[in-house]
Amino acid sequence: MFDEVIYMGVHGVAISATVRIKRISWGTVARWLESAARYAERFNQRKLKGFVIHELQADEIRTFVGDKEQVVWVLTTLEVWSRLWISVVVGRRNFRNIKTGILDTLQRGRIERRFLFTTDGFEMYEWAVKRLLAGVCIYGQVIKKRREDRVIRVERRLLLGTKSELEEALFHSEDSNTLNTSFVERHNLTIRQGSAYLGRRTPCHARHSGSLMGQMALMMMYYNFVRPHMALKFGKMVRTPAMQAGLVAKRLSFREVFTAFFIFFFIAVAARCCRLEFKQSRQGFWRE
């Protein structure tokens, strides 16, 4: 039942709905999700590294925690060729968090040649990229002009690198024909659909940033290692982003990912039972 609850948690099912469906207590569901999120974060730190960076895109998701006045942003970074979700940062939309996301990406991945990096027009990206990635990437921005929530014009800016270098990078890209943020925007839609906390116009929201970050760590593990990606399908063989990036040889299951967690859980339960039994036997000895 543990893996079923986690599976529902990464498919947009709120805790209250999970309680009604599985007929278990709210506290049990919340505790299982919290434990799974902690383990998923450690799993990501251990497994999500050593891949080659071919093409990057970054974007943000706007949401809130606690109440609608406490706006936070979820910064995501995507490796386009493998569709690997590399980094996530929850917090304010500022230079510090963007810098944190870029540094995390650099620490996890390997750079074999200058890669293409595309973001939206937020100026903090330009500052961070020119300080951290000068000489290792070709950087451009895609700026969408809107009127009444409709895109009326798209402007593309090349801010790092030459036009010939951009053309060469696009020639080698298997996905992009021009500067775009389409892949990370579609990825962010997948995140919104999978997290009850990020749904628009919903009463379900995270109580604090830690809960939201835990949810994102759990979803990152599921997206990269468990969930098959249809864009990576090869014939009848379905693949995950981690398989495409060469991090694992097969699609993992929740049971495989959480094997160590299950072992620790059963050992902890057994130890607790032994302590209770020893305590009861000792109390009986002194009564005699």
Where do the language-model regions lie?
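Residue-level recognition of single "structural anchor" positions
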Residues: M1-A270, C274, F278, G284-E288
